[in-house]
């Protein structure tokens, strides 16, 4: 069934303290499948990034339901991506008074849902 891009609704979580590479491996698994299936997959995946992704997905579905009046059972994840956010600098003390810089990466998670078109 084709996806209706006119009814696309999105939700964004910004400055999540997680590497975008680690978030993308989970988003690749749920892109293009239904909302209910994605919740089940996220529930049982062993990755830490599933928690913020699940929150963003539920927020996108709530936006579709409350703002556009779309039935959640017809929703499919049309877009899901993670952009790189700013890296937080931290310093690790080293020998002889030196310090190494440590990057603490952040990411912005975007999930868009759209309803299926009836043929």
From Swiss-Prot:
Q: Which UniProt keywords apply?
A: Ribonucleoprotein, Ribosomal protein, RNA-binding, rRNA-binding
Gene Ontology BP terms: translation
Q: Which GO terms describe its molecular function?
A: rRNA binding; structural constituent of ribosome
Q: What Pfam family does this protein match (any one)?
A: Ribosomal_L22
Q: Write down the Gene3D superfamilies for this protein, in alphabetical order.
A: Ribosomal protein L22/L17
Classification via SUPFAM superfamilies: Ribosomal protein L22
Q: What does this protein do?
A: This protein binds specifically to 23S rRNA; its binding is stimulated by other ribosomal proteins, e.g. L4, L17, and L20. It is important during the early stages of 50S assembly. It makes multiple contacts with different domains of the 23S rRNA in the assembled 50S subunit and ribosome. The globular domain of the protein is located near the polypeptide exit tunnel on the outside of the subunit, while an extended beta-hairpin is found that lines the wall of the exit tunnel in the center of the 70S ribosome.
- Identify this protein by name: Large ribosomal subunit protein uL22
Q: Which organism is it from?
A: Trichodesmium erythraeum (strain IMS101)
